[in-house]
């Protein structure tokens, strides 16, 4: 997902028309995952190309936040050249200070959302506006 391509043919999208890919542009970023059972010698599969940001969505409660998952996502984001954004949900159900303090040294953009505060989503929208995103989380 995310490859930029050049097409030829009928690009109207009407039924019974044909178009084809004639070129695939170079990727500016690539998020990959490793595969142990793939024939490719690199053992990797591209998940998304040309993304700008990775939004790491984490519930603070029900279930509790898993810092290992956050850490793995951060490593993948930095490796792929993506800007990580940490989005914490269910902040009305748990204390978030300890988690925020743990990731403060990374200088991450962090958004805290609450179901009873619709305005808390505005900052997340602002950070993601006009950008190609990859969302990860539980």
Predicted regions and their residues:
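N-terminal accessory targeting/assembly segments
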Residues: 1-67
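Residue-level signature of catalytic and energy-coupling elements of molecular machines
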Residues: 2, 77, 128
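A generic structural signal for short, solvent-exposed coil/turn residues
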Residues: 13, 85, 102-105
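Conserved beta-strand/loop subsegment of P-loop NTPase cores
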Residues: 50-58, 79-91, 107-114
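Short amphipathic alpha-helical segments
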Residues: 67-70, 98-100
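Histidine-anchored nucleotide/phosphate-binding helix
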Residues: 68-78
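Canonical P-loop GTPase G-domain recognition
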Residues: 90-138
């Amino acid at each position: 997902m995310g490859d930029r391509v050049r097409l030829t043919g009928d690009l109207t999208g009407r039924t019974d028309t044909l178009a084809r890919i004639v070129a695939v542009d170079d990727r500016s970023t690539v998020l990959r995952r490793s595969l142990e059972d793939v024939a490719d010698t690199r053992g990797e599969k591209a998940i998304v190309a040309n993304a700008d940001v990775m939004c790491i969505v984490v519930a603070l409660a029900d279930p509790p936040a898993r810092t290992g998952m956050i850490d793995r996502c951060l490593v993948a984001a930095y490796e792929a050249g993506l800007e990580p954004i940490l989005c914490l949900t269910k902040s009305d159900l748990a204390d978030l200070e300890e988690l925020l303090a743990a990731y403060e040294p990374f200088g991450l953009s962090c958004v805290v959302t609450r179901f009873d505060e619709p305005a808390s989503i505005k900052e997340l929208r602002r950070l993601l506006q006009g950008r190609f995103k990859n969302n990860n989380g539980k």
